[in-house]
Amino acid sequence: MQGIKNLTQGPINRQLFNLAMPIMATSFIQMAYSLTDMAWVGRLGSEAVAAIGSVGILTWMSGSISLLNKVGSEVSVGQSIGAQSQEDARSFASHNITIALIISICWGTLLFIFAEPIIRIYELEDHITANAIQYLRIISTGLPFIFLSAAFTGIYNAAGRSKVPFFISGTGLILNIILDPLFIFGFGLGTNGAAYATWIAEASVFLIFVYQLRCRDALLGGFPFFTRLKKKYTRRIFKLGLPVATLNTLFAFVNMFLCRTASEQGGHIGLMTFTTGGQIEAITWNTSQGFSTALSAFIAQNYAAGRVERVLRAWYTTLWMTGIFGTFCTLLFVFFGNEVFAIFVPEQAAYE
């Protein structure tokens, strides 16, 4: 198949590592959008960080929902590639993109319309609530870019070409880093400036993906982005992606109410500390998800090709790789927690 990297042959350790590193880096880049916003907005004060932190949980929830088509793409397209069925691979790719667009429009519309009652869950001061509502409404209009880019990323991961999403997402992050101080301080837009910078960066990532697929790669021999949904493919995608998306969404939902408790007990400082700490802690589970995603793409191709022994060896390899990194992060957070937190929010009241 055109543009595909065969994962059913060759050294397992090297293939997993080469596949996982760009995926992990891409996950860190997605996390870095929020951390970059917090690092710059932190210079405006803890109240501004609390405003975008309250929206950060909803951004996390949106990313969790987008996993339906990211995971759906990785497994459905990957299995089709392993089974040497290019027609199914192309159909699954088109269906995942179409479903991602539909869900993103519906979810983004809900967040935009109900922004005020959602943000008031946190019971913040009125001026912080107003900033958060404006920030959420700006971000919600860019959700189709995020969901479609997630589907594109899943398709590339399934094809064994995880470096492409990494470089594209990295370009978006660099643009966000450049635009954040310009919009926040240069144009004097404050928290709204961070939202506009992120919106432009995410839109740019989407456009680069479109250019890459249409003009450079012709992945899977080329496939239509949008298609009329068929029950066979749609049901399979939901069966594969919905459990992961539901679990992550419930996790984000629980954290939303933990944020309310933090706000009730500690005001905007409590909320800001909780949300920022969660973003930093996400380093660990973003890493584990990176390896998990690489393992999913690897298993999808090898399972469909009947290479069960490679599936088992890949699973054991992933366990010890993630175990080593998890131990390192635990030591870092336990012994250097204050220093890590102060990088993003320099106010001592937030981390002491």
Regions found by a protein language model. Give the residues of each.
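Interhelical loop/hinge segments that connect adjacent transmembrane helices in multipass membrane
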Residues: M1-N18, T198, V210-F251
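Signature of the first transmembrane helix
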Residues: R14-E74, G78, L242-A262
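Residue-level signature of transmembrane alpha-helical cores of multipass secondary-active transporters
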Residues: L19, I23-M24, W60, A100, ...
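Residue-level recognition of transmembrane alpha-helices
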Residues: A20, S27, G53-G56, A100, ...
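Helix-terminus/linker motif at the lipid-water interface of multi-pass membrane proteins
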Residues: F28, A32-A50, I119-D126, L182-L189, ...
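Small-residue-rich hydrophobic transmembrane alpha-helices
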Residues: V49-T109, I146-P165, T273-G337
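Short membrane-interface helical motifs at transmembrane helix boundaries
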Residues: C106-R137, F328-E352
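Membrane-interface helix-loop junctions in multi-pass transport and translocation proteins
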Residues: L173-L207, G337-E339
